[in-house]
Amino acid sequence: MTGELTLLPAVDVQGGRAVQLQQGVASSERAFGDPLDVAQKWQGLGAQWIHLVDLDAAFGHGSNTKIISSVVEQLDINVEVSGGIRDQRSLESALSAGATRVNIGTAALEDPQWCDEVVGRYGEQVAIGLDVRGDQLAARGWTREGGKVLDVLARLEDAGCRRYVVTDVASDGMLTGPNYELLGRICARTQGKVVASGGIAALEDLRRLRGLVPIGVEGAIVGTALYVGNFTLPAALDVCRAPIPADSSPMPPTD
């Protein structure tokens, strides 16, 4: 990835459909059609990455493995696969299907030894998902608490994790803006890169995130705002690729 802010349109799959949830609540879905059609639409509009999520696997209510694999195999761009990656078999299945990167969430909390081994072995092919509610991590599709985020982050730093996907659960799908304070806290405590997720509602949000590239924000996952038409993907990509304004200064670290 380059010095620009990398944009990852989200394609979340539940029950075989592309959906968007509010705050990760399974019953809050809005459907947007066939996942492959949606992913190919974003690819055709210029996306270089897709954030592809198996929500059923994340919630532990089945999986969409065949659909996920089909989408990965039929795209010509980078795909980050997330949802239900909790053991070696599911990790290798996603990578063998052609995923550029795999996002590990619950396993980072429930099986730290395996997670630390994976971080060391796979390097850039793995990101750790930090799904944050308050100062706690959320696990199992955001249905359980998983410990204090800064404690888990310290352990992952010791293991050499290179990238974190940081989601503010309260903002996700709500179009209320990213949690910039949370991003600042994480960036101040890691040598790795951070991909921001949750709450992006307008191009101005992307401009602000673009200004955080110098402190470690590498990318942004955008879902609902694209699906409901708050802005177009080409317009968003233009913002993410634009030079950082001269009067832009990174936020100070937050204790």
From Swiss-Prot:
Its EC number(s): 5.3.1.16
Pathway annotation from the record: Amino-acid biosynthesis; L-histidine biosynthesis; L-histidine from 5-phospho-alpha-D-ribose 1-diphosphate: step 4/9
UniProt entry keywords in alphabetical sequence: Amino-acid biosynthesis, Cytoplasm, Histidine biosynthesis, Isomerase
Catalytic activity: 1-(5-phospho-beta-D-ribosyl)-5-[(5-phospho-beta-D-ribosylamino)methylideneamino]imidazole-4-carboxamide = 5-[(5-phospho-1-deoxy-D-ribulos-1-ylimino)methylamino]-1-(5-phospho-beta-D-ribosyl)imidazole-4-carboxamide
Cellular component aspect of the GO annotation: cytoplasm
InterPro entries: Aldolase_TIM, His_biosynth, HisA/PriA_Actinobacteria, Isoase_HisA-like, Isoase_HisA-like_bact, RibuloseP-bd_barrel
Location in or out of the cell: Cytoplasm
GO molecular function: 1-(5-phosphoribosyl)-5-[(5-phosphoribosylamino)methylideneamino]imidazole-4-carboxamide isomerase activity; phosphoribosylanthranilate isomerase activity
Enzyme class: isomerase
Record Pfam families: His_biosynth (PF00977)
SUPFAM superfamilies cross-referenced by the UniProt entry: Ribulose-phoshate binding barrel
Active site: 12 (proton acceptor), 131 (proton donor)
Record has Cell division as a keyword: no
GO biological process, one term: L-tryptophan biosynthetic process
Family membership noted in the UniProt record: Belongs to the HisA/HisF family.
HAMAP family in the cross-refs: HisA
PANTHER family reported in the protein's UniProt record: 1-(5-PHOSPHORIBOSYL)-5-[(5-PHOSPHORIBOSYLAMINO)METHYLIDENEAMINO] IMIDAZOLE-4-CARBOXAMIDE ISOMERASE
NCBIfam families: hisA-trpF
Protein name, per record: 1-(5-phosphoribosyl)-5-[(5-phosphoribosylamino)methylideneamino] imidazole-4-carboxamide isomerase
